[in-house]
Each structure stands twice: as C-alpha cells, then as structure tokens.
C-alpha cells in the first residue's frame, strides 16, 4: 500500500496515527454505505444508518422503508407478521 499523505500548511505528513485515523474514516464510510454495525454511542437501527443520498437497489430500498413502517405501526412487535392484513379482522375474532 502507498503511504498516506495529508497536506497541512504546505507540509506533507505521513504518520501511523494519521494512517489509522484515515483508515477508520474509510471503514466508517463503508459501514455507512452497507448498513453494517458501526461503533457508536447511539443504538440506531440499521435501516436508519443508510444515508439518504445513496439509492439502494429496488428490493433493498423498499425493504428499508417497509421495515421503518413496521416499526412505526408495531413498535412493540406484536402482530408484525400480520402487517399487510392489518385492516382485515382475523378469523378468530369473527363470532
């Protein structure tokens, strides 16, 4: 790998600390893109970690917003499997 250089005040710096910092920046950027686990003090669900500027492929894009809608409509995770049929009464309750 080539050396990492940064121009600060006209001087080129190549230091292990700077290299680690830039490697960590690129790692965090990569994890933002793929929505993987990122070391953070905030526990944010993975769909919300994906930046809005990146347009995901169709199914993943829809899955992100479907998952967010599930969290909004079913915050306690009850009836989450009945998401698409939530307007219809279940046969057990029809008496």
UniProtKB/Swiss-Prot annotation:
Residues of the signal sequence? 1-20
Q: Which UniProt keywords apply?
A: Signal
Q: Please state what the protein is called.
A: Blastocyst protein 4
Q: Which organism is it from?
A: Oryctolagus cuniculus (Rabbit)
Native organism taxonomy: Eukaryota, Metazoa, Chordata, Craniata, Vertebrata
